[in-house]
Amino acid sequence: MDLQTQLQELKTSTQAKLAEMRGEHSKELQELRVAVLGKKGSLTELLKGLKDLPSEERPTVGKMVNEVRDVLTEAFDEAAKVVEAAKIQAQLDSESLDVTLPGRQVNLGNRHILSQIAEEIEDIFLGMGFQIVDGFEVETDYYNFERMNLPKDHPARDMQDTFYITEEILLRTHTSPVQARTLDKHDFSKGPLKMISPGRVFRRDTDDATHSHQFHQIEGLVVGKNISMGDLKGTLEMIIQKMFGAERRIRLRPSYFPFTEPSVEVDVSCFKCGGKGCNVCKNTGWIEILGAGMVHPQVLEMSGVDSEEYSGFAFGLGQERIAMLRYGINDIRGFYQGDVRFSEQFK
């Protein structure tokens, strides 16, 4: 039998065997591939016969060998796909799924308590006609300090209190720069400016139960004609009562902030004793909660606002402070440690 006939028979017989392969024949398929195309396989043995052919026949037979090899290689690849698909289908047919079984329980997360507090406060202010304005966490010395009427020698500008990146660039110590930038652009012909600016702020504090090198503030600003201290008090009373209950009262104590004049500390009647005196309020009946005041005329003038025609008030409160008072939390570090046992209490 000549070599060409043997090649044709090898191709035909191999294709016939491949056509019979099923899902359970994956092992047999691999064995057949090795027997036909392997280093010691049938095709390799036939190739050895090329050297015995006359020189004029070798190119034709050699070409036929390559064609047979290509055809069989492709046939084996296709058979492997068929066998694998049949194997998978057999597995699917043999297994059943009980659709009445309960699904796996998914552990859902929840909003962080600080996010909840921020959203609650923002919703209150939106209902009062305020706008919410975000700003840069990396600020210039000019907007963070000078525009807030903080002179160069003010203690708050000391390196111990502020994270400086360069001599003129720093991590903001409050969200007041957002107010200054907004005040610069506001068109008072369209009405007064009413805004809050929430966000993270940074101080060079040593972390302990009541201090953190970063925390969250929400600062508010209202500027318009005939804005008075009475407007400030009424606004703060509404906020405190919505946050802590309608029975809460506030009081204003004189204080000092460079960017407000006059300035006040705002206290709220104790949540625990109702103002009678207890360990929470240190027997005073009051708890300090935020700082506020009338916008300093110089701050208005630096934004090009006529302080003779316009006035305003500003205030700032901390989200952590609100949460700690509302829920009786004693350690501010709990907000940042990612302990699920802590955070899941506030679902």
From Swiss-Prot:
Q: List the disulfide bonds.
A: none
What GO molecular function terms would the record report?
Answer: ATP binding; catalytic activity, acting on a protein; magnesium ion binding; phenylalanine-tRNA ligase activity; transferase activity; tRNA binding
Q: Which GO terms describe its cellular component?
A: cytoplasm
Q: What is its EC number?
A: 6.1.1.20
Q: List this protein's GO terms for biological process.
A: phenylalanyl-tRNA aminoacylation
Q: Where in the cell is it found?
A: Cytoplasm
Q: How is the cofactor bound?
A: Binds 2 magnesium ions per tetramer.
- Recorded protein name is Phenylalanine--tRNA ligase alpha subunit
Q: Source species, please?
A: Streptococcus thermophilus (strain ATCC BAA-491 / LMD-9)
Q: Which gene encodes it?
A: pheS
